[in-house]
Regions:
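Negatively charged, low-complexity tracts enriched in Asp/Glu with abundant Ser/Thr
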Residues: 1-12
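Mixed-charge, Lys/Arg-enriched low-complexity segments
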Residues: 50-77
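A generic short-segment signal for beta-strand/edge and adjacent turn/coil regions
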Residues: 1-2, 17-22, 76
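A short, structured beta-strand/loop element
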Residues: 16-48
Length: 77
């Protein structure tokens, strides 16, 4: 299954895409920077990102929750 779940702007020419994709028979969570190709408005994936097995979703959510907690405690959010 290849499905983009969320897309948000990183800057004027790049966006972050979060989704699920299949690679070599493995289902992966993919968080990746996509960039606009020069001279067009087509977006292409870059090597900047991370793919991980879908079974790591719980650990990923826990880590992001901890990051959010620390940022709030530090008054950064």
């Amino acid at each position: 299954m290849d499905k983009t779940v969320k897309t948000f702007k990183k800057n004027k020419f790049q966006e972050i895409r979060v989704g699920i994709r299949e690679y070599k028979g493995n289902d992966l969570i993919d968080i990746r920077t996509w960039t606009m190709t020069q001279g067009t408005e087509a977006m292409v994936p870059t090597s900047k990102g991370v793919s991980m097995n879908i079974h790591l979703i719980t650990e990923l959510k826990e880590a992001l929750g901890e990051v959010e907690r620390i940022l709030k405690e530090s008054l950064m959010l």
